[in-house]
Amino acid sequence: MKLHELKPAAGSRKAPKRVGRGTGSGLGRNAGKGEKGQNARSGGGVRPGFEGGQMPLYRRLPKRGFTNIFAKTITAVNVDRLNIFEDGTEVTIDALIEKGIIKKVNDGVKILGNGELKKKLVVKVNKYSKSAAEKIEAAGGKAEVI
């Protein structure tokens, strides 16, 4: 097989709809736009959310809440995800990113207690739930706050 012999899978490519090219094509005359009216015109149509003059849904529903600019975004990790580390490893935020457990850290990392921990680890992150700290220590490890 060579590069010039590559072809797309059968049925994966569809020819574009050629409208307004004569009645024999099946899409001549009005080109699929119906008869007259706003939608038949050049640039015609209504904006998203417009309901024909009726009070639209997004204006009928009340506003609610606000965005707290001081809110902290904590990245959560359950203890069962830590089993991919070797016994005796020091688990830091950088180690979690390196292993692909978390993508990025905004305002810190919190370890939660869902699942079981089978490895003895020294974990160094910002926060722990009570059950997570207990499980880390029960496995023979340490839960250190940084």
Curated annotation (Swiss-Prot):
Keyword line: Ribonucleoprotein, Ribosomal protein, RNA-binding, rRNA-binding
Coiled-coil region(s): none
A GO CC term assigned to this protein in UniProt: cytosolic large ribosomal subunit
Compositional bias (Gly residues): 21-31, 42-52
Segment forming the signal sequence: none
InterPro entries: Ribosomal_uL15 (IPR030878), Ribosomal_uL15/eL18 (IPR021131), Ribosomal_uL15/eL18_sf (IPR036227), Ribosomal_uL15_bac-type (IPR005749)
UniProt record, GO biological process: translation
Pfam families recorded: Ribosomal_L27A (PF00828)
GO MF, one example: rRNA binding
Stretch list, region Disordered: 1-54
Keyword Membrane in annotation: no
Self-association and partners: Part of the 50S ribosomal subunit.
Family classification: Belongs to the universal ribosomal protein uL15 family.
Function statement: Binds to the 23S rRNA.
Name of the protein described by the UniProt record: Large ribosomal subunit protein uL15
Gene designation: rplO
